[in-house]
Amino acid sequence: MCPARSLLLVATLVLLDYLSLARNLSVATPGPEMFPCLHHSQNLLKAASNTLQKARQILEFYPCTSEEIDHEDITKDKTSTVEACLPLELIKNESCLNSRETSFITNGSCLASRKTSFMMALCLRSIYEDLKMYQVEFKTMNAKLLRDPKRQIFLDQNILGVIDELMQALNFNSETVPQKSSLEEPDFYKTKIKLCILLHAFRIRAVTIDRVMSYLNAS
C-alpha cells in the first residue's frame, strides 16, 4: 500500500528543490524541441508574480505580505498535484509505481507525442484542475472588486489570459465549475484581503507548475 501521508510530506519538502535542477538545465527561449507547455508555464509564473507585486503596492495599507496573511490552499483535498507530479527517482515504494509506465493517450498540445505514461497524464490533469479552480475564484473575486465604488484594484485580463492559455494547451475535458455569485453587497475590505491570500497561494502553485514543466522539458 502506498504510504500517502509520508509521500505527500516528502513530496512537499523535496519536489521544488528537485525540480529546480531541471529548471537550471532548461532553455529560456522556446524552441522546436522544447516541451510545449514550458513557455505557457513561464508566462503563468511571470503573470502571477507581477500581479502579486502590483496588489501589494496598491494594497500597501492592507495585510498583504506573506508574513501578514493567513495562508490558504484552495486546492487542498481536491487535487493531488504534488503527489502526481513527483519524479520517479524520488519514489522508493514499488507498489506506488505499478501504473506509472502504462501508456496513456492525451489530447493536449503539452506533449510532443500524445502517448504518455498514466502518471504523467495524471500530473498534467491535476495541474489543469488547479488552474480551473483558481480561474473560477479569480473571476468571482474580480466581479466583486469591479463593484467597488473606489475601483481601487481588480485583476487585469493578463493573468486570466495566461491561465486560459495553459488550460487550453493541457486540453482535458472536465466538469464546468459554476462561477459563484451573490446579490449581497460584498465586504470590499475582506475581498481585498482574500485577493492577497489567493495571489500568494497561486504564485506558489505557479512556481510548482513551472518547475514541473521544466523537469519534463529536461527529461
Curated annotation (Swiss-Prot):
Compartments where found: Secreted
Gene Ontology terms describing biological process: immune response; interleukin-12-mediated signaling pathway
Glycosylated sites: 24, 93, 107
The keyword Secreted is annotated on this UniProt entry: yes
Pfam families reported in the protein's UniProt record: IL12
Gene3D superfamilies per UniProt: 1.20.1250.10
Key word Thylakoid present: no
Cysteine disulfide links: 37-110, 64-196, 85-123
Keywords: Cytokine, Disulfide bond, Glycoprotein, Growth factor, Secreted, Signal
Record's signal peptide: 1-22
Function: Heterodimerizes with IL12B to form the IL-12 cytokine or with EBI3/IL27B to form the IL-35 cytokine. IL-12 is primarily produced by professional antigen-presenting cells (APCs) such as B-cells and dendritic cells (DCs) as well as macrophages and granulocytes and regulates T-cell and natural killer-cell responses, induces the production of interferon-gamma (IFN-gamma), favors the differentiation of T-helper 1 (Th1) cells and is an important link between innate resistance and adaptive immunity.
Subunit structure: Heterodimer with IL12B; disulfide-linked. This heterodimer is known as interleukin IL-12. Heterodimer with EBI3/IL27B; not disulfide-linked. This heterodimer is known as interleukin IL-35. Interacts with NBR1; this interaction promotes IL-12 secretion.
Family classification: Belongs to the IL-6 superfamily.
Protein name: Interleukin-12 subunit alpha
Species in which this protein is naturally found: Macaca mulatta
